[in-house]
Amino acid sequence: MKFRIYPAIDIMDGKVVRLYKGKKDEVKVYGDPLKFAEKFSEYVDKIHIVDLDGAFSGKPQNLDIVEKIIRDVGVRVQIGGGFRDYESIKKAYDIGVENVIIGTKALDISFLERITSEFEGITVSLDSKGGKIFTKGWIEEESLLVEDAYKMLRKFVNRFVYTVIDRDGTLLGIEKIKRFWGDEEFIYAGGVATPTDIIQLAEIGFSGVIIGKALYEGTISLEEALEVAKSVGKKNYSSS
C-alpha cells in the first residue's frame, strides 16, 4: 500500500488555524483556506480538512468553503468536524467530499451501520488521550480504550484516523505506539514534525500521516515529506 501524506487545513471562523492540543483558546491563525488548498494541490491530490467550528458546535459550519475548494481547486477532500447526523454527512458527499470522518457518532452503532450501508468512504476517527477515546471536540472522555473502540468498530469500516490529542499542534514528535490494528487503512495525526517521525510511523504500520502545524511553521516541507513517504512506501512496512 502506498504511504500517503495528507496536508491538513483546520478551519475556524473561515480561516486556517492550528490549535494547541485541540484547545480552542490556544489558536494561531494562518490565513485563507483556499490559498493553502491551492498550494498543497501542487503536490498532492488529496487533503485533510477539519471543520473546527463544527467539532465544537456539533454541526459542520464551513461546508461552503469546502465546496469551493473542491470546485475551484479540484483537489480531493477528506473532512471531519461535527458530522453527527445523517443530513450533514449527506450534504458533504453531495458537494463532492470523498471521505467523511466521524468520531463522536461512531460510538452509536445503529447510526454507524446506517451510514456505512449508504455511503462509501466513511472513516472513523479514534481520538486518544492517555489511551482513552475522547469525543465532542476532544472535550468528553469516554470509558473506552482506543484498542477496544477499534475492535468494536472495525466490523463497519476499514479506514481509521488515529489522533494523539496531547501531541496535536505541538511539533513534539510522535509518542511510542504499538500496532493494535490489522490490514485496515490507518492514518496517524498528532505532533509530526520531522522526516524521522514519518519513517517511524511507517515502520509501526501506519498507511499514512496527517501533517498540519509542521507545514505551516516550516519544520518540514511538503516536498520533503512526500520524498520520505515515497521511500518508505517502497519498503512496504504496512504489510509486514
Curated annotation (Swiss-Prot):
Pathway: Amino-acid biosynthesis; L-histidine biosynthesis; L-histidine from 5-phospho-alpha-D-ribose 1-diphosphate: step 4/9. This is 1-(5-phosphoribosyl)-5-[(5-phosphoribosylamino)methylideneamino] imidazole-4-carboxamide isomerase. Belongs to the HisA/HisF family. One of its GO terms (cellular component) is cytoplasm. It catalyses: 1-(5-phospho-beta-D-ribosyl)-5-[(5-phospho-beta-D-ribosylamino)methylideneamino]imidazole-4-carboxamide = 5-[(5-phospho-1-deoxy-D-ribulos-1-ylimino)methylamino]-1-(5-phospho-beta-D-ribosyl)imidazole-4-carboxamide. GO terms for biological process: L-histidine biosynthetic process; L-tryptophan biosynthetic process. InterPro entries: Aldolase_TIM, His_biosynth, HisA_bact_arch, Isoase_HisA-like, Isoase_HisA-like_bact, RibuloseP-bd_barrel. The active site is at D10 (proton acceptor), D127 (proton donor). Its EC number is 5.3.1.16. Its main location: cytoplasm. It comes from Pyrococcus furiosus (strain ATCC 43587 / DSM 3638 / JCM 8422 / Vc1). GO terms for molecular function: 1-(5-phosphoribosyl)-5-[(5-phosphoribosylamino)methylideneamino]imidazole-4-carboxamide isomerase activity. Pfam families: His_biosynth. Keywords: Amino-acid biosynthesis, Cytoplasm, Histidine biosynthesis, Isomerase. It is found in: Cytoplasm.
